[in-house]
Amino acid sequence: MTHYHFVGIKGSGMSSLAQIMHDLGHEVQGSDIENYVFTEVALRNKGIKILPFDANNIKEDMVVIQGNAFASSHEEIVRAHQLKLDVVSYNDFLGQIIDQYTSVAVTGAHGKTSTTGLLSHVMNGDKKTSFLIGDGTGMGLPESDYFAFEACEYRRHFLSYKPDYAIMTNIDFDHPDYFKDINDVFDAFQEMAHNVKKGIIAWGDDEHLRKIEADVPIYYYGFKDSDDIYAQNIQITDKGTAFDVYVDGEFYDHFLSPQYGDHTVLNALAVIAISYLEKLDVTNIKEALETFGGVKRRFNETTIANQVIVDDYAHHPREISATIETARKKYPHKEVVAVFQPHTFSRTQAFLNEFAESLSKADRVFLCEIFGSIRENTGALTIQDLIDKIEGASLINEDSINVLEQFDNAVVLFMGAGDIQKLQNAYLDKLGMKNAF
């Protein structure tokens, strides 16, 4: 048994990885800021100790896992080096873990967390699968055959991994604080493709993914019969979305997903492709798909009277459009009200017009002040620049949250990657519900 200390344990990936090592029988603790972060709930439920940052946390015989947000000058990292302990970055450590399994990386600008959550749930319907999801959820199952994990492209972190398979959901320009342009993003994915050992499953309608070159087969999925695996006869029902799946032009089977929206069918196709390639039992896969309950902060719903309140991590224009589409398809007779908190000044500046276009698909839009990050907490841009581009949009905060009560037959979408949940909870408090998210 090894004693691990995680520097930045409340980070979504770090939290997941700490849980995995705990489940596998190791002694685990970590440190982070004292502010509440939703990822700490799962850590505390497993009895994993969370400490405030302090050099004295670091003891002899520990292995220290260094979170990506923390430099080598951090007091705990400095102490670890003074004690001559092994200090391993999150990416390198995860790369070592996955080599023990048949591994499936899920990467892409959008849809990583939802697809990884679905993949881990569905594969566990037939084979033991350990998993690491970007919503702070992780589980290490002893004697697992497979390992499903989220692989982030930011700062090219995913180049630390050499997975057996990679699901590539899409390539899009994001993280403008690091990537120069879409070509820079493509180059990162192209390099990652050469790390894959068995096969790549990629969305067929993505023009950039169609240009990817690899040393292994690339299987494209989508809605066209020119794709290697595709869905047809899609029907929206009160139980979710039903569809037929074809592989290489031949009917494979009929599936039902409890979710709504084209993007959820695409996620399911990617997962079904992995199951098909690994020859998993299709009956078990179908049953598992029908019971998928979603992942944290991805269209999580609470219903109060005729109002449906949704918590969603959407923080990029394409993700906002997908979330609004899901609301329209699932609740076609309700208004859609978007409450959005932009995340980072650089992203808001880079996609200002795209944010305005995607948010305008809602019936009414409310915007919060821009949420900064550890690396970037100021900027010349203000939220008024975005408000001015959306007809009827207005600023909202905890003092004005009552305005949402007038939409008594609506889906209210709280979207963002910052602390938008504070606003949600303030609204739920006013409605007499606490701690829903």
UniProtKB/Swiss-Prot annotation:
GO molecular-function term, one example from the UniProt record: ATP binding
Disulfide bridges in this chain: none
Keywords: ATP-binding, Cell cycle, Cell division, Cell shape, Cell wall biogenesis/degradation, Cytoplasm, Ligase, Nucleotide-binding, Peptidoglycan synthesis
InterPro entries listed in its UniProt record: Mur-like_cat_sf (IPR036565), Mur_ligase_C (IPR004101), Mur_ligase_C_dom_sf (IPR036615), Mur_ligase_cen (IPR013221), Mur_ligase_N (IPR000713), MurCDEF_pg_biosynth (IPR050061), UDP-N-AcMur_Ala_ligase_MurC (IPR005758)
Catalytic activity: UDP-N-acetyl-alpha-D-muramate + L-alanine + ATP = UDP-N-acetyl-alpha-D-muramoyl-L-alanine + ADP + phosphate + H(+)
Binding site for ATP: 108-114
GO process annotations (BP): cell division; cell wall organization; peptidoglycan biosynthetic process; regulation of cell shape
Subcellular localization: Cytoplasm
Enzyme Commission code(s) on record: 6.3.2.8
Known pathway: Cell wall biogenesis; peptidoglycan biosynthesis
Origin: domain of life: Bacteria
GO cellular component: cytoplasm
Predominant location category: cytoplasm
NCBIfam families: murC
Family indicated by similarity: Belongs to the MurCDEF family.
Functional note: Cell wall formation.
Protein name in the entry: UDP-N-acetylmuramate--L-alanine ligase
